[in-house]
Amino acid sequence: MKDPNGVVIYEGTSQLDNETPIIVIMTGLEIASSNDKTGDMIQTWVILKDTPPHVAIKTGEDSAICGDCKYRGVYNMDTGVWDEERPCYVTVHQAPLAVYRAYHRGNYPAVTPKQVRHLIKEHRTGAVRVGSYGDPMAVPVGIWENLLKNSKRHTGYSHQWEIQRDAKAWQPIVMASADTELEAELAAKLGYRYFRVMPDTLQNKSIEVLCPASVEAGRKSQCAKCGLCAGTASHARKSVAIVQH
């Protein structure tokens, strides 16, 4: 029997609403990601346990894994159209839906925290993408702390940083996702490094660096090799900015 490409690392309640059952699936163990920007990274998918992701974005149930992220959009179930367009870059009927279906087919075995650490240690690159879909803060912070013990590099982003009480624990795990200069300033005051989406290339060069994997930066690196977006764990002084497309 072949080793699985994915495993279940969490089955429990969303930390965003404290009631909705969610799961976290770790994939990319055997098959490398084909994402040119990120490179070969272990992927982690935060999804609802009982509702397919392409359905959840329309019913609004995705709030249990995405919180109040403005990129969710608003779907009108009565008219069957989006009242507010969904600008999120994740195409949920592709990878997230495939992962959801594979989970319900029983393709992903559940693993212990010790096994998770071993899988990370033995991985080709040891690079982890925290929250390939879904906000990491929907998951208990201890799940990520364990996951990252043996990682070589990681990326992580959250739009829920303003409401998270245990900021000190999260700051080494995620970048605060900022959509305005004001949000970026607030995130920095709270102790987060941030990842700011900006309308042009006018980043504040004294405190921000242009994402090395972006087109504007000449695609100098990939996320799997870079390590800048690892929150305060990266020990980088500057935060990161990228041009919105």
Q: Positions of the model-derived regions?
A:
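Class I S-adenosyl-L-methionine
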Residues: M1-H245
